[in-house]
Amino acid sequence: MADGTGKMREVLRGLPPFPEELPEFDVQAAPEDPVTLFLTWFNAAVQDKILGPQIMTLATADGAGRVSSRVLICKDVDDTGRWYFASSSDSEKGRDLAANPHAAASFYWPQQGRQIRIRGRAGSAGRRASAEDFLARPPASRAAALIGQQSKPMSELADLDDAFRACEAKIEADPEILAPDWTLYALSAETVEFWQADHQRRHLRLQYLRGDDTWTRRLLWP
């Protein structure tokens, strides 16, 4: 284990990056669109009982180009090549997207040595879709969203407890109450890359690029 005495580099180099067995990826048999391949890989991750296959990392940048990233849940994927996630429009990511809609998302399933990278533009999926997403959330999640204040300084934990109790009471009194800033976002992919690890470092990378009406595919050097 790393002990803070300069051995961190050795510890990191000694950790295995991939499992002994890795799935095959026949790039020649890949479908014409990235959504079909994404669903194939995602379903394989579910069948292999990969923990949290729906979790993705979302990177955004503010108007000055300062980048930040966070882990969140993918809420849906549609046939047009849009990946959905939800958040407060007043959160850091929401403010970033209001100033700069360009965003990137990635899925990583280390037990399979697979990564999927998505780049494009993100925007609101609309008020109705946002309301439906909010009301489908568990009560505790709705209470957290009603509190708001995400990423803002908090004086003490007791403030969080008080805010939760107050918002849980609001939900009990009105089960249809909505958080006005809750937004379902759609990341419309411009490029989607599928990466399959290889023990000999002959990693396979297949990238899809969106055209006017169709997707084109190309291999990338690892």
Model-assigned labels for residue ranges:
Residues 1-222:
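Binding-site signature for planar aromatic cofactors or substrates
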